Each structure stands twice: as C-alpha cells, then as structure tokens.
C-alpha cells in the first residue's frame, strides 16, 4: 500500500505545479487587506460643525462667516465647536434682538452637520459619523472582526466537507459580490451588515487557501511557502495606501478594491483541488488524475507500481477540547498559547487600525506599515532557527509591547518619532503572529493539534473583536489604548518563559508522549517525509505546514 506522502515525494516538494498554486493563492492574499483596512480610510477625520439652518431660514443679509458666529460657539483654539451649537432664538426674533440679547445657550447639534464645500463623499460625512455617532466607525470594525470569527467557525468544517477548491471559489464569489454591493448601500446600518457578511468569506478564505497550499507542498518547503503567501498580505497593504490616496470617494474606492475579484473567474479551471482531500473521500480516480497532472507539470515520472498501490487516506485518532485541560503540562501550554494569540491579534490590529493617529500622513504610514511586514515575516524564519521558538516568541511580543508603551511618553509634536516607534511595533507584532503559527502547532500533540489550533484561532478573533473597542477608550484618556496594547503583549511574552522549547525536538503524537519529555533530533537526521507527514497531518491552517521543527 502507498500513501499520498510517498507520492508527493515522487512529485517533488516544491516544483512548478506548487509554484503555480502558490501564485494563485498569493493573489487572493494580496486582495484580502482591502477588506480588513480600507474602512480606516473611509472614516478619516475632517472638519465639521453643526448646520446653521435656522440662520439661513431668516432673511438676514449675513455672510457665511457671520452666520457661523451667530450659530456655533468657538472652542479654546478658536475653531467652531464640532458638536455644539447655540440654542436657536424664537422664530420671530429680529437680528437686533439676537445681537442685543446674545442667545448663547448651547445644545447638541439637532439640525445635522456641515462639512467643507469641496469635500469628497466619505462614510463619515455621508452618514454623519461624528459626535454622538462617532463610535460607529470603530464599532463597525468590531462587527467585521465578529464576522471573521463566524467565518472561521463556518468555513472550517465546510472546507473539509465539500473540498478546498469549492470552498475557495465560493468565498471568492461571496466577498467579491458582497464587496461590490457595499458600494451602493443607502444606510450605514446596511453597510455594517454587509461588512459582517464579507468578513465571514474573507476569514474562511485565509483558512482554506493555507490548507490547500500545505497539502500540496512537501515538508522541506511548507513553512517558506506559507510565509511567502503571508507576505502578499503585506504587499496588499502597501497597494491599499495608493488606492486610498487616489480614490478619496469612498464608493469609488470600494468598487476599485473589490472589482479585481471578478477577473479571477478563471480560478474555476486553474485552481486544483487537494489530492489528499480527494483520497480521504475515496475519490481515487480524480486524485490519480490530479497527481499525474502535478507530476507532468513538475516534469517528474511516477512509478506505475506506486500508483497502483495508492490507497485512500485514513483519518487518524483525534481528541476533544477537554483533553487540552486534563493533562497539567498541556493545560499550562494551552492557557498560555490562548493568551499569546489573543494579544497577537490585539496588538497587530490595534496598530493597524490606528494608522492615522501617529501624526504623519496616513497614506505614507500605511505604505510603511505594509512594507515593514515583509522583512518581519521573513526574518521570523531565521529567528526561530537561530534563537528557537520560545525566545523568538518572547522577544517579538516584548519588543512590540515596549514600543507601544514608549509611544505614550512621546510628545504629539514629534510625529516622526511616534511613527518610527509604531513601525517597529508593527514589525514585532507581525513577526510574533508568524511565529505563533509555527510554535503553537508544535506544542500541541498530533491527536489534539487541529482542536488546539482551532481554539487559539477563536481567541485570536476575540482579540480582534475587542481591538476597536479598546480604541474607544481613548475618549476617556488618550494613553489607554497604547497602554493596553503595550502591557498585555509584555505579560504574554513573559509567560512564554514557562513554555517548553520545540526547536530541534520531535513532534508529540499522543498525551503519553508528553510524559516522556523532549526527544532531541539531530538536524542531520531529519525525519522521513512519511514520518513527518503522519505527525503533522491536519486540516487546520496553522498546522499542516509544520511537519518538522527544521526548515
């Protein structure tokens, strides 16, 4: 009998077929940042003040500036108050009465708001996301993050049920059509509902494409392939800065960012299914046909005897979530990893969503944020090889946290310094996220790896949901968000000292293996592909690419 791992060895770990697949999936990762972060550029701050309709309704021969003086008080800086207006005088009051009696009692705006005349439509000025509605711009991001959580829970099982290709195509169609529909919404409530819907598709996409990639790429290239795919997410952030700069009209920006999905209709024919998934479903003929195509593209010859001995893949034994808490050592690992993923998400999205709050041009800052993620993600591979998983995870978390803490003490009139610190923090959190995928998968035993990675993914999404709400705390004190983004990663990083090192160790298969302690393995005796595949096999996106602690 032959298993798929043996066939993959003959096809090649990373040939032309896998490179073509990587490119197809990189395009999807490249498009994803628009859905995550474009909203930030649609709600940028802009001058506004209460509408002065009552003045205009009088037949006063006043200039616009004089009308403003009569209707809107000034703040301490001498600018019109954005959320207050003078209480209107009686309808029959004359201009002399108004000037002599000085109607100067204030009240919240009740006649709408006015914005600069040359403004372009934005979510903020079209739906009046100001004053008592200001919180909605951050609440919308929490709704989006909640959609990511639902999408992860929904499309994960669906990916195993109907296949990787079908799931990816369905998600591509969903987030493209919903994204285009978002550009034509008549109300902000409908906009929020569609943001939730598109988030479910985007979350499922990140799950499905990593799964498909890791099931076709061999052990020696899996980690590098996944990191390369993640780097395209960073490149997408850089392009988003240019798009947002060029299209200030939020509806045009929404259409421009989502329409490219329509050009990917050829994925229906170009994207391959996972041969391993076909084998687990007993669809032998389709799997063999796909394997032969992969071998042909890679210019490799398949042994007829090996193909004749190919048998359906069998799913190994699995545990349940409660098993993660029954074993003392595993319970400690699980709780700490929950904390790590929670703060990974909190810090990463916290800095990303506050890209306009560091003092420099928001478009330039977004470009820099995307650019620094590429070396950050790539360098994480070398850090894990040089310093091990534990110390790399600890170092990146603490570094990211310290940058956020230091920002609190930097004066606002030094925007370059603040932005530089934020950039270093963004690099550290991006690297920490990448390390978490590898380290977490190696810490869980094989029978619980899929369950464990699924649960840490949930905690990551919870961190994302809370991130915009943490930003709202800045209304009470400007330092609170950065204090939280800084202190929690430092605490989580210090907790990593309690975790075991996994670099150079054999992967654990069962709970009993945890009792045996570490099993060091010489780098020269890297495990066979069959062994590593058996130990790393899973359908979880954070798991399948970890088949050995050497890469």
From Swiss-Prot:
**Which residue ranges does the entry give as Cytoplasmic-facing topology?**
1-20, 160-167, 217-224, 273-332, 376-397, 449-452, 500-551
Q: Which GO terms describe its biological process?
A: negative regulation of fatty acid metabolic process; nicotinate transport; positive regulation of T cell mediated cytotoxicity directed against tumor cell target; urate transport
Q: Where are the transmembrane segments?
A: 21-41, 139-159, 168-188, 196-216, 225-245, 252-272, 333-353, 355-375, 398-418, 428-448, 453-473, 479-499
Report the Gene3D superfamilies cross-referenced here. Answer: MFS general substrate transporter like domains (1.20.1250.20)
**Membrane topology per the record?**
Multi-pass membrane protein
Question: Which residue intervals make up region (Disordered)?
Answer: 511-551
Pfam families recorded: Sugar_tr
Q: An example Gene Ontology cellular component term from the record?
A: Golgi apparatus
Q: Which reaction does it catalyse?
A: urate(out) + (S)-lactate(in) = urate(in) + (S)-lactate(out); urate(out) + succinate(in) = urate(in) + succinate(out); urate(out) + glutathione(in) = urate(in) + glutathione(out); nicotinate(in) + urate(out) = nicotinate(out) + urate(in)
**Protein family membership:** Belongs to the major facilitator (TC 2.A.1) superfamily. Organic cation transporter (TC 2.A.1.19) family.
* Protein name as annotated: Solute carrier family 22 member 13
The gene designation is SLC22A13
């Amino acid at each position: 009998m032959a298993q798929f791992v043996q066939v993959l060895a003959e096809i090649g770990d990373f040939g032309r077929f896998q490179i073509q697949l990587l490119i197809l999936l990189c395009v999807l990762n490249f498009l994803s940042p628009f859905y995550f972060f474009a909203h930030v550029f649609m709600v940028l701050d802009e001058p506004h003040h209460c509408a002065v309709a009552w003045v205009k309704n009088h037949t006063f021969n006043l200039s616009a500036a004089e009308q403003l003086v009569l209707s809107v008080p000034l703040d301490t800086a001498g600018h019109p108050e954005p959320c207050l207006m003078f209480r209107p005088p009686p309808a029959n009051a004359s201009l002399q009465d108004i000037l002599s009696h000085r109607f100067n009692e204030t009240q919240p705006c009740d006649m709408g708001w006015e914005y600069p005349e040359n403004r372009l439509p934005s979510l903020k000025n079209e739906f009046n996301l100001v004053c008592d509605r200001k919180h909605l711009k951050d609440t919308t991001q929490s709704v989006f993050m909640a959609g990511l959580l639902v999408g992860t829970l929904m499309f994960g099982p669906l990916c195993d049920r109907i296949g990787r290709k079908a799931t990816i195509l369905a998600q591509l169609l969903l987030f493209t059509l919903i994204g285009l529909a978002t550009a034509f919404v008549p109300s902000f409530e409908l906009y929020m509902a569609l943001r939730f819907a598109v988030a479910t598709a985007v979350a499922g996409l990140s799950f499905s494409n990593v799964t498909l990639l890791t099931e076709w790429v061999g052990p020696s290239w899996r980690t590098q392939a996944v990191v390369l795919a993640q780097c395209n997410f960073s490149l997408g952030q850089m392009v988003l800065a240019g798009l947002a700069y060029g299209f200030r009209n939020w509806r045009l920006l929404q259409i421009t960012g989502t329409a490219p999905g329509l050009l990917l209709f050829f994925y229906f024919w170009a994207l391959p299914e996972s041969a391993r998934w076909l084998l687990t479903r007993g669809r032998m003929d389709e799997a063999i046909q796909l394997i032969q195509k992969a071998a042909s593209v890679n210019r490799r010859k398949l042994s007829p005897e090996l193909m004749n001995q190919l048998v359906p893949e069998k799913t190994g034994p699995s545990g349940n979530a409660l098993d993660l808490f029954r074993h003392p050592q595993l319970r400690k690992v699980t709780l700490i990893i929950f904390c790590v993923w929670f703060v990974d998400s909190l810090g990463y999205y916290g800095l990303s969503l506050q890209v306009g709050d560091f003092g420099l041009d928001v478009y330039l800052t977004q470009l820099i944020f995307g650019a620094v993620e590429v070396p950050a993600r790539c360098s994480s591979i070398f850090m894990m090889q040089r310093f091990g998983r534990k110390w790399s995870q600890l170092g990146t978390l603490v570094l990211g946290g310290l940058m956020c803490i230091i920002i609190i003490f930097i004066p606002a009139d030094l925007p370059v310094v603040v932005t530089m610190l934020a950039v270093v923090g963004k690099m550290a959190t991006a690297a920490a996220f990448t390390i978490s995928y590898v380290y977490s998968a190696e810490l869980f035993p094989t029978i619980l790896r899929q369950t464990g990675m699924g649960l840490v993914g949930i905690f990551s999404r919870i961190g994302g949901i809370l991130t915009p709400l943490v930003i709202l705390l800045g209304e009470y004190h400007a330092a609170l968000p950065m204090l939280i983004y800084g202190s929690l990663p430092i605490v989580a990083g210090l907790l990593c000292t309690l975790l075991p090192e996994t670099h150079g160790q054999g992967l654990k298969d069962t709970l009993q293996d945890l009792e045996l302690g570490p099993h060091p393995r010489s780098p020269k005796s890297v495990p066979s592909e069959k062994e590593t595949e058996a130990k790393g096999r899973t359908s979880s996106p954070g798991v399948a690419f970890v088949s050995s602690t050497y890469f």
